[in-house]
Amino acid sequence: MSDSKSDGQFYSVQVADSTFTVLKRYQQLKPIGSGAQGIVCAAFDTVLGINVAVKKLSRPFQNQTHAKRAYRELVLLKCVNHKNIISLLNVFTPQKTLEEFQDVYLVMELMDANLCQVIHMELDHERMSYLLYQMLCGIKHLHSAGIIHRDLKPSNIVVKSDCTLKILDFGLARTACTNFMMTPYVVTRYYRAPEVILGMGYKENVDIWSVGCIMGELVKGCVIFQGTDHIDQWNKVIEQLGTPSAEFMKKLQPTVRNYVENRPKYPGIKFEELFPDWIFPSESERDKIKTSQARDLLSKMLVIDPDKRISVDEALRHPYITVWYDPAEAEAPPPQIYDAQLEEREHAIEEWKELIYKEVMDWEERSKNGVKDQPSDAAVSSKATPSQSSSINDISSMSTEHTLASDTDSSLDASTGPLEGCR
């Protein structure tokens, strides 16, 4: 990037209802997703020769909440470097000064699909356990830095056709050391842990509940706790898992406890009935063993009382998962979060704006000095060409046939379905 920005470095293109003003190195923009946090386009990076995802943060300075989320996401993405966490490749703004500053663009790896597009596939145990292993590795890496994701759901987990998986979207991630009372509307309702629903606060294994919900959804092909609202979500949980013990009730605030204790009592359904043998792969005796292990893992993750729920470390060592265990992945050095006050910070919008601007300028300065001129090892295959289109919106070619890819063979056919090969 040149020492001073010029209009010639950027060009504008209309994407849905938004205008993307991006560096000219990013061509062939195509919208692939949108949400409260921003709009995402697939693009081809003519400098690195790879397909990337360009995310434009939606009105990051419209209020303090949006501004804080934007700052948090940017800081965390800059700090985290793990093969199961999405990699940040570039950050830029087309504006030249703090006074003009209003747009933030994040450039990240482009994957083939998110888990929403995988839910209805018939996954064998090998692929399912490997996807879960990677999910847990990514979560453990975040937890090792005191970061709780808080918003794990199928749309925030992306995969490639070689069965690699990455976690994305850190707008809601929060450091664990912060003293706070949780708002119940942190996580998408279906994946929200009981302690969040009941306003108990949380610890790291709040993310394990979400993983359990996602695993259950992968097994059954549908959302397992599909509440219509906040209260109904709790009802759906206890209808299946049973009314919690008196010991758990004592941990609740009096008003919440009064409500919970006055709900109809449910004995709960056995996990053998919630997740019967026939919904798992059962082609061999080995599959039957794996089915028993998978169900056992679900029963340990989907526990209402967080004090009795399995931890990330325990999940990684569970028989269903541990076959994949690699210390380099599961015990990677924790990321160093350079802003120790990441959560305690409270600022006016203009102050948040200045902090974010400094982060963007810091990235651009480091890029000029060659610190960030290449993607990390986790980036997508550099063999992509402009003519290769990501299959992120076309998963019709997904294969459920068991084909193993070499650990070292990262080359991908762009027409291949997201889970065509698993290591």
Curated annotation (Swiss-Prot):
The active site is at 151 (proton acceptor). One of its GO terms (cellular component) is nucleus. Residues 366-423 are annotated as: Disordered. The modification Phosphothreonine is found at residue 183. It catalyses: L-seryl-[protein] + ATP = O-phospho-L-seryl-[protein] + ADP + H(+); L-threonyl-[protein] + ATP = O-phospho-L-threonyl-[protein] + ADP + H(+). ATP binds at residues 32-40, 55. GO terms for molecular function: ATP binding; JUN kinase activity; mitogen-activated protein kinase kinase kinase binding; protein kinase activity; protein serine kinase activity; protein serine/threonine kinase activity; protein serine/threonine/tyrosine kinase activity. It is found in: Cytoplasm; Nucleus. The modification Phosphotyrosine is found at residue 185. Dually phosphorylated on Thr-183 and Tyr-185 by MAP2K7 and MAP2K4, which activates the enzyme. Autophosphorylated in vitro. Its cofactor is Mg(2+). It comes from the Eukaryota. Residues 366-375 have a biased composition (Basic and acidic residues). A motif (TXY) lies at residues 183-185. Residues 387-416 have a biased composition (Low complexity). Its EC number is 2.7.11.24. Belongs to the protein kinase superfamily. CMGC Ser/Thr protein kinase family. MAP kinase subfamily. Serine/threonine-protein kinase involved in various processes such as cell proliferation, differentiation, migration, transformation and programmed cell death. Extracellular stimuli such as pro-inflammatory cytokines or physical stress stimulate the stress-activated protein kinase/c-Jun N-terminal kinase (SAP/JNK) signaling pathway. In this cascade, two dual specificity kinases MAP2K4/MKK4 and MAP2K7/MKK7 phosphorylate and activate MAPK9/JNK2. This is Mitogen-activated protein kinase 9. It comes from Rattus norvegicus. The gene is Mapk9.
